[in-house]
Design a protein with these regions (language model features):
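Short glycine-rich, low-complexity segments
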Residues: 1-141
Length: 141
């Protein structure tokens, strides 16, 4: 249920998500993907959290991780529902970041969640420079 006091703000979130989705799908001559990392906040301003590689089923060196940072994969303009992929937060030492503030680098993953963007009242865009940012010669653990 969308409350009256959040209705306009919710529509604002949907519009922002649509704009970011368009930006990410815009192509240019460089053939590089544009990824705009986002954090979504619930009505009590708690960041959305999701888990990737639960049960360590994917063959990667990190195992299960928690994140509040996502990439928009898809949004349905009529329902304001869509799909987010989880961005893996990495600290400056190449390990999974334990907090958002420890995040030095973001890595794309194949882990996704489906969301209703009407459930959120705030969206924070993070720097695109975080995505696949070099660790400065540090080898990930």
């Amino acid at each position: 249920v969308i409350t009256k006091d959040c209705m306009n703000l919710t529509n604002c979130i949907c519009k922002s998500v649509i704009k970011i989705d368009r930006l990410q799908n815009k192509t240019d001559c460089t053939c590089e993907k544009t990824i705009v990392p986002i954090i979504l906040y619930s009505k009590d301003f708690t960041p959305l959290k999701a888990f990737g590689n639960v049960g360590d089923v994917e063959d990667d060196c990190f195992g299960c991780f928690e994140t509040s940072i996502f990439k928009i994969e898809y949004i349905c303009k009529t329902t304001c529902c869509g799909k987010l992929s989880l961005l893996r937060p990495i600290d400056e030492h190449g390990s999974i970041a334990k907090t958002i503030c420890e995040t030095f680098r973001l890595e794309e993953t194949d882990f996704c969640i489906d969301v209703n963007f009407h459930c959120f009242c705030a969206l924070q865009r993070l720097s695109m420079a975080l995505v696949n940012r070099p660790l400065g010669g540090i080898i990930p653990k």
